Amino acid sequence: MYAVVQTGGKQYRVQEGDVLFVEKLNAEVDSNVELTEVLAVNKDGKLVVGAPVVEGAKVVAKVLKQGKAKKVVVFKYKPKKDSRKKNGHRQPYTKLQIERIEA
């Protein structure tokens, strides 16, 4: 059994026991979150596609970690002008473990 869920503007294909990194969610570590935007569910070889979401379906996941991704360095410069700018960005993320799919 698997499901396609949407969170943080991205879509993920998940099964029970999967570990995935999603855009930051406001949840405490070791708490459970419900992902209610389930776009599709495959149960017993039968695919149910929502329009736009599957009614009554949800995915329950446990928050394992809140963290930041590796730093992305942005360096801008203009040649011959002595103009340089160096910026860095670390995107926050939430690490989830899928516990169950309810459909």
UniProtKB/Swiss-Prot annotation:
Residues 80-89 have a biased composition (Basic residues). InterPro entries: bL21-like, bL21-like_sf, Ribosomal_bL21, Ribosomal_bL21_CS. GO terms for molecular function: rRNA binding; structural constituent of ribosome. Residues 80-103 are annotated as: Disordered. One of its GO terms (cellular component) is cytoplasm. Pfam families: Ribosomal_L21p. Keywords: Ribonucleoprotein, Ribosomal protein, RNA-binding, rRNA-binding. SUPFAM superfamilies: L21p-like (SSF141091). Disulfide bonds: none annotated. One of its GO terms (biological process) is translation. This protein binds to 23S rRNA in the presence of protein L20. PANTHER family: 50S RIBOSOMAL PROTEIN L21, LARGE RIBOSOMAL SUBUNIT PROTEIN BL21M. Belongs to the bacterial ribosomal protein bL21 family. Part of the 50S ribosomal subunit. Contacts protein L20. This is Large ribosomal subunit protein bL21. The lineage of its organism: Bacteria, Bacillati, Bacillota, Clostridia, Eubacteriales.
